[in-house]
Structures are given as C-alpha cells and as structure tokens.
C-alpha cells in the first residue's frame, strides 16, 4: 500500500490529520495537471478542491484497487473534462491580459518545480504538442506515475500509453531541436 493510501486509511479510521497529509502530497501536482485542461488557475484550484471533497464525501468509491495518486488524478481528469465540456458552451474567449496575469500566478505556483531556461523551453514545446502526448508525458515524468497508473488515468492500455509517451518525446525533441530529453 502506497503512502497516500496509508494516509487515506488512517483518515477513514478517524485521523483528521491524515487528510491534510494527502492534500499536502497531491494538491500542487493535481492543480497543475487540471490546469492543463481548463487553462484557468482559479478553476483548476476549485476542481482540485472538489477532488478532495469527493474523497471525504464518497470514501467507498476508492476501494484501494489502485494507488491513491492514480485515483486522485483520475478524479481530477474526469472533473476537468466535464468542466471543459460544460464551459465550452457558455464561456467567452478569455481576455489576453487576464490570461497573462493567470500565467504569472501559475508561474509562482510552479516556481519550485520549474527551473531554468531549458525547462521553460520544454514547457513551451509541451504546450505545442497533442493533448494526449502532453497528458501522458505529464503523468509519467512530472507526476511520476507508472505506465500502468498513467494508462488508468487516461483510460488507455499500458501499450497505448507507451506509444503516446514515445511519440510525445519525439515531438518535443523535434520542437526543441535537440536529441535528448
């Protein structure tokens, strides 16, 4: 049982501090992951909060069949996709100045994760590739999920995920003009 699942088990047994540990472990990564879908920091934070509320309100849905991180990121993905689907019908195009301000806020959140010029170039390249490639690379390399766990989040087979990661790395290399990531 992974550390997150152990903390969740303690929470279910009445240890309220364990929920704080779970939030501390996964909150920032989950917000960054959801942000890739919704492209709005406030919405990403709200959806991440909804994921943690889901853990409290519906504990029976987890079932300890996968790692807690996989379950949390699957919930995050589902909530983000639902949100984007609903918003695409009603949301006007975002003001560019507002978008820049959000990106500045996001940079503050990411500042301890992303360092240096190479990482900036890498993220620009990641933003330019197909959504499935970007999601696969994010889950495997930034969130450090196994191929099996990441495949579960994306509703793909491990082989399909392996192909997405390979193609994503190739696309990023081509965009960066380098031979290695």
Name what the model sees in each region:
Residues 23-41, 58, 126, 171, ...:
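Amphipathic, Lys/Arg- and hydrophobic-enriched alpha-helical face
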Residues 81, 125, 133, 142, ...:
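DNA-recognition helix of helix-turn-helix
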Residues 90-115, 146:
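Internal acidic/polar
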Residues 51, 75, 137, 149-151, ...:
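Hydrophobic positions on the alpha-helical face of helix-turn-helix-like DNA-binding modules
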Residues 60-64, 74-95, 115:
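Arg/Lys-rich amphipathic alpha helix in sigma70-family domain 2
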Residues 32, 46-53, 66-78:
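Structural recognition of an alpha-helix C-terminal capping motif at a helix-to-coil junction
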Residues 12-13, 39-40, 50-67:
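Sigma70-family region 2
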Residues 1-29, 170, 174, 181:
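N-terminal module of bacterial RNA polymerase sigma factors
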């Amino acid at each position: 049982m992974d550390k997150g699942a152990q903390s969740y088990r303690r929470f279910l047994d009445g240890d309220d501090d364990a929920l704080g540990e779970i939030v501390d472990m996964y909150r920032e990564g989950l917000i960054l992951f959801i942000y890739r879908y919704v492209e709005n920091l406030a919405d990403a934070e709200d959806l991440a909060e909804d994921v943690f509320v889901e853990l409290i309100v519906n504990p029976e849905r987890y079932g300890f069949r996968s790692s807690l991180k996989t379950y949390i990121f699957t919930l995050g993905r589902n909530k983000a996709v639902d949100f984007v689907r609903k918003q695409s019908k009603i949301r006007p195009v975002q003001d560019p100045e507002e978008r820049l301000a959000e990106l500045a806020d996001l940079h503050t959140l990411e500042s301890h994760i992303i360092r240096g010029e190479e990482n900036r170039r890498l993220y620009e390249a990641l933003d330019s590739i197909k959504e499935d490639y970007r999601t696969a690379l994010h889950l495997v390399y930034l969130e450090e999920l196994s191929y099996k766990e990441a495949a579960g989040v994306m509703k793909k087979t491990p082989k399909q995920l392996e192909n997405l990661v390979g193609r994503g790395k190739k696309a990023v290399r081509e965009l960066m003009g380098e031979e290695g990531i």
